[in-house]
A protein has these predicted regions:
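C-terminal interaction module
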Residues: 1-47, 156-232
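Internal, hydrophobic cores of structured domains that mediate oligomerization or house catalytic pockets
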Residues: 41-156
């Protein structure tokens, strides 16, 4: 599985602001009904406390979205939260799963609105299926950048993330990576095979390969350009 992983520093976002950002991202994240089920939230089964079922929600209804965010935040905090910071947990089912009988759930999680943290705490993750088309990855990345305005965002598998020696709060460098304007970035460290495109208040960096199998050699070059150490 691939994950689009991003984050940003202290930034106050209200419940309404988070709901608006979430809805804005839904407008552009591909929602092919032949491929994906509807977005929903996990709810405990009334007859079995150890079982959770995905309950679809109307992502176009602001009240429904804000209620979903509030419910997750209260569950995470074991009650109403008095300090800034909200939690978002959504998922949808991959319908054309051919890998087996077990369903594949693609999750969309975020922490937003946190302030006064010693280290960056605002964070988002969107899970994507293996073998996904590059154009879908690009659209999902752009949707998240425009909606959440992160400092950094990248798409990579867990193996690629580990192989590069990633440590928070570094950007996860993958086949496609976004960094916000003002981030340390030495373009002279890159070669001609790495494509840099300016858009959405920052730059998108594409390395050779595919979303599932990007060039690790070029990922290391991008990490050098960002001032990060590389794994041995």
């Amino acid at each position: 599985m691939l994950k689009v992983i991003g984050g940003w520093g202290n930034r106050e976002d209200s419940l309404q602001a988070c709901a608006q950002r979430l809805q804005q991202s839904f407008e552009y994240i591909p929602a092919d009904p032949q491929v994906y089920g509807p977005w929903g939230v996990w709810r405990q089964d009334a007859s079995d406390n150890d079982r959770y079922e995905l309950a679809p929600i109307d992502t176009t209804d602001r009240d429904v979205v804000t209620a979903a965010i509030s419910a997750v935040t209260e569950r995470v905090n074991n009650g109403p939260k008095a300090t800034p910071g909200l939690n978002i947990e959504l998922a949808r089912r991959l319908l054309d799963n051919t890998s087996g009988a077990s369903p594949i759930w693609l999750e969309y999680t975020a922490r937003a609105g946190f302030i006064g943290m010693k280290r960056p705490f605002n964070h988002l993750v969107l899970t994507l299926e293996d073998g996904i088309d590059e154009s879908v990855v690009t659209r999902a990345m752009s949707a998240l950048v425009v909606a959440w305005e992160p400092d950094r965002l990248g798409v990579a598998s867990q193996d690629v993330q580990r192989a590069q020696g990633h440590k928070p709060p570094e950007a996860v460098v993958g086949w496609l990576t976004y960094i916000k304007d003002g981030t340390q970035f030495d373009r002279d460290a890159l070669d001609a095979e790495i494509v840099v495109h300016e858009a959405d208040g920052g730059v998108y960096i594409t390395v050779p390969g595919t979303p599932d199998d990007p060039s690790m050699e070029h990922i290391r070059r991008v990490r050098i350009a960002l001032g990060y150490p590389n794994a041995d």
